[in-house]
Amino acid sequence: MTMVKLEQIFWHVWINGDLVPYQFARIHVLTHSLHYSGSVFEGERAYNGKVFKLKEHTARLIKSAEALGLKVPYNVDEIIKAHECVIKQNNIKDAYIRPLIWCGDESLNITNQYLSTNLLIAGIPSMPRSFEKGINLHVSRWRKAMPDSTPVQSKSAAQYNMAITSKKEAKALGYEDALLLDYEGYIAECTTTNIFFVKDKILYTPIADRFLNGITRQTIIEIAKDLGLEVKEERLKLEQIEDFTGCFVTGTAIEVQNIDSIDLGNKKIIFDDHKIADRLKEEYRRVVRE
């Protein structure tokens, strides 16, 4: 998916119940969440004017906020209606949708019971882009935090600091993305996507209890099972990936992306069997437009 430049967007965004022209959507420089990463968000995609898995995304948005102790002044149905308002106002067909919940600028104290909780829903024009060419991964030196040190199932801004750093380092070395390990050295995910491996028509994917269990990940598992494929969720070590013939990642924006190689430092593992990933990609693109 390719994005237009943000300054070229002329759509309206929804902020706390009001539709605001994109260029006038602003927050104060002393906004609490800007300083302390106290915000949560979702990444969603609209296909033919309908957001895929909107109810699931919205429920997770609220759950993410509650995990950080934020009081969300809207329920699932109200947030869904706000999405519909944005889609109708901007005549959206295909777009990336970004809901964001953040704390206001009433105080810079670490905790303050009088901080407001705000909600934004913005649409960003997008169009599908061919991902026929696979990408290459670099194993990041950074590890995912322990689940008891951060709410890993909360899609919070703070969770992305390491992901951003890891991806920057990978790209500087000539790779498209980074593979992240958990605190015990098991394979976790990529910076913004979940990872799958293929061998003998069986899918292997890390257990999603140490990182965000992606909605696209869950959908791909459902599709794979419907196609008669076996899916195994396991703890996976780096040394195991030499046994796999295929690899791909999943995410809302990227959908299904083939992986051509993973550089382990002392050797590069090549994946040249993309048949199952391509089949899943085809079926996923059908499902999201139903």
From Swiss-Prot:
Alphabetic keyword roster: Amino-acid biosynthesis, Aminotransferase, Branched-chain amino acid biosynthesis, Pyridoxal phosphate, Transferase
EC number: 2.6.1.42
Residues the record lists as N6-(pyridoxal phosphate)lysine modifications: 155
Enzyme class, first EC level, given as a word: transferase
GO biological process: isoleucine biosynthetic process; L-leucine biosynthetic process; L-valine biosynthetic process
Pathway: Amino-acid biosynthesis; L-isoleucine biosynthesis; L-isoleucine from 2-oxobutanoate: step 4/4; Amino-acid biosynthesis; L-leucine biosynthesis; L-leucine from 3-methyl-2-oxobutanoate: step 4/4; Amino-acid biosynthesis; L-valine biosynthesis; L-valine from pyruvate: step 4/4
Swiss-Prot/TrEMBL cofactor(s): pyridoxal 5'-phosphate
GO molecular function term, any single one: L-isoleucine-2-oxoglutarate transaminase activity
Keyword Amino-acid biosynthesis tagged: yes
Reaction(s) catalysed (UniProt annotation): L-leucine + 2-oxoglutarate = 4-methyl-2-oxopentanoate + L-glutamate; L-isoleucine + 2-oxoglutarate = (S)-3-methyl-2-oxopentanoate + L-glutamate; L-valine + 2-oxoglutarate = 3-methyl-2-oxobutanoate + L-glutamate
General function of this protein: Acts on leucine, isoleucine and valine.
Family: Belongs to the class-IV pyridoxal-phosphate-dependent aminotransferase family.
NCBIfam families, per the entry: ilvE_I, PRK06606.1
Protein name per UniProt: Probable branched-chain-amino-acid aminotransferase
